[in-house]
Amino acid sequence: EKVVRYDFHKYSIENWSKGGISCKTFYETGRFAGILKRIRKNDYVIIALQHNDKKPDVGEKVADYKHYLTYFTQHIQRKGGKVIFMTTPPKNYADRKTFKIYVPEYRNAMLQVAKDLKCNYIDLSKLSTDYFNFRGKNYVNTLYMKLNPGQYPAWEQGINDDTHFQRDGAKVLARIIAVDLQANRQIPMLN
């Protein structure tokens, strides 16, 4: 998968994510090396790896997860970059009426690495879980890829995806992130 680039007035954003990737596979596939080649002093790197790190086929144990996060951060900082960690939103399980933080042990590990390495973070796990519980299941179902047959041509049979978001869901998450970034005055680019 390619890197997606967005250019705004004085900012350029590159999205190096890839579906199904964990910290380990992000490193092993060379995606992290690609980021390191492009980093310049004072660049920000948002690390949001968590959802796939528990999967047995691509993931790793919590200790290994912390190792990769630490490795990534130290190498980014050596190049003059700044890391912002971001925990991931909850899953939307059909059999649950409320939302819970997904893989809390990995969330806690990420927050611990952020604290240990004095990095900023966005706790999207907590922020989105709280917001989703406030708004309720019916509303939140419209944000995830829970599509009826025929609703979209690409998914003629429908889809019941409890992890990924539709465009409206992505916009809600972007608003939650933007509000948190604006409230977090420790990040100089936002002052």
Q: What do these predicted regions represent?
A:
Residues 1-17, 33-41:
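Serine-esterase "nucleophile elbow" of acetyl-processing enzymes
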